[in-house]
């Protein structure tokens, strides 16, 4: 009997004697005429193995119907799953509709690709949809990146720390053991507000991001811009409001009832329908600014001739049809920084938090009041 025939017969015997007749990596190695450790190298992206040997091992695997090493067994052996959890604001569906989230995830993916790890997107919302909490509790992730912040995120941190899972936050959450990629919200909004004041505006309304856990609801009431400021948990919202108040202490604000354009338009409408409407609206992000433009157009209000509208983020909004006056933050780069922080933490090193710069971008939506 030839050597190849003996190998095939030996493998057939292994298949009959193994549980449920399953094929193992040792079976593949025997058929390919290599050691089990050499056969395992064919399924890794790194390792010293010649192309010819890899091809022979994969041919043997195909002949035996072997799909590859059990990822759970590999995870148990290495202590790594090769998965990084990424928690987004609200639902995953809405994250894919958000240009800020998309640009950040693109940068994050670019950096994580270099680490040869996969990503698991998790929703940050709470009831009636449970969100990330029950998923993360038993999920074998190597690290978690938060693209959101708030009470629901803070509640997850103790469990992750107890499991010694590295945590990275983009604009939060802030706390012990969290590496944060931040931007200078206060400086950016302050510079933007001073620009608007320099144009001559004094009657100003602030269109505020929602602080609600639930997805949808009516706009909030018109209140002074600084009312209840310290009670706002979201640091980004709070810092941008504080900066606007420092320049326009008499400004008013309205909170959007949700994250979509319709919710922002409804909130902007509340400001525009006031007996003495503002001559300028400072929106806390570019999507809210787009909503304000829609609300103005629906009322025949010209921008910037009759109304100044500004945003924050510098998001890619080609469908807007005009260049928005806004504050640009490095959306792609903050994702890259977050991914590199993950790499540092997985390597057992310390990842220092960073504050990235922002800049004022003048566009076509701001002018002196009529």
Which residues fall in each region the model found?
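N-terminal helix-turn-helix DNA-binding module of bacterial transcription factors
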Residues: 1-80, 370
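Hinge/beta->alpha junction and helix N-cap segments in small-molecule ligand-binding domains
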Residues: 90-103, 122-129, 150, 181-191, ...
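Alpha-helical recognition/docking segments in bacterial nutrient-uptake
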Residues: 1-23, 83-86, 91-198, 370
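Flexible loop/turn connectors
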Residues: 2, 269-270, 274-370
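Short acidic capping loops at alpha-helix termini that bridge into adjacent secondary structure
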Residues: 202-203, 251, 303-308
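Glycine-rich phosphate-binding loop signature in dinucleotide/nucleotide-binding domains
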Residues: 64, 139, 199-201, 271-277
């Amino acid at each position: 009997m030839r050597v190849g025939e003996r190998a095939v017969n030996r493998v057939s015997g292994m298949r009959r004697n193994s549980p449920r007749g399953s094929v193992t990596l040792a079976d593949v190695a025997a058929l390919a005429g290599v050691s089990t450790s050499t056969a395992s190298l064919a399924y890794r992206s790194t390792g010293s193995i010649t192309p010819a040997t890899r091809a022979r091992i994969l041919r043997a695997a195909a002949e035996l119907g072997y799909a590859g090493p059990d990822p759970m067994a590999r995870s148990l052996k290495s202590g790594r799953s090769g998965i990084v959890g990424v928690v987004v604001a609200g639902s995953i569906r809405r994250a894919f509709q958000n240009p800020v989230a998309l640009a950040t995830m693109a940068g994050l993916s670019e950096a994580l690709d270099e680490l040869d790890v996969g990503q698991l997107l998790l929703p940050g919302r709470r009831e009636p949809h449970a969100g990330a909490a029950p998923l993360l509790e038993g999920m074998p992730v190597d690290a978690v990146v938060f693209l959101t912040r708030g009470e629901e995120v803070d509640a997850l941190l103790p469990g992750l720390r107890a499991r010694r899972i590295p945590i990275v936050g983009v604009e939060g959450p802030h706390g012990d053991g969290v590496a944060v990629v931040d931007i200078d919200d206060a400086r950016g909004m302050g510079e933007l507000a001073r620009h608007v004041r320099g144009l001559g505006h004094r009657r100003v309304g602030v269109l505020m991001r929602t602080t609600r856990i639930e997805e949808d609801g009516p706009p909030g009431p018109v209140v002074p811009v600084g009312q209840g400021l310290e009670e706002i948990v979201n640091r980004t919202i709070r810092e941008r409001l504080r900066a606007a108040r420092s320049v326009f202490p008499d400004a008013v604000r309205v909170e959007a009832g949700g994250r979509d354009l319709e919710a922002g338009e409804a909130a902007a409408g509340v400001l525009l329908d006031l007996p003495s409407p503002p001559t300028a609206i400072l929106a806390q992000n570019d999507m809210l600014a787009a909503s304000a433009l829609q609300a103005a157009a629906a009322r025949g209000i010209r921008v910037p001739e009759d109304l100044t509208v500004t945003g924050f983020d510098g998001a890619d909004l080609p469908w807007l049809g005009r260049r928005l006056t806004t504050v640009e933050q490095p959306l792609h780069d903050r994702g890259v920084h977050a991914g590199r922080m993950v790499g540092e933490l997985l390597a057992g090193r310390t990842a220092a938090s960073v504050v990235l710069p922002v800049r004022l971008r003048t566009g076509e939506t701001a002018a002196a009041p009529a």
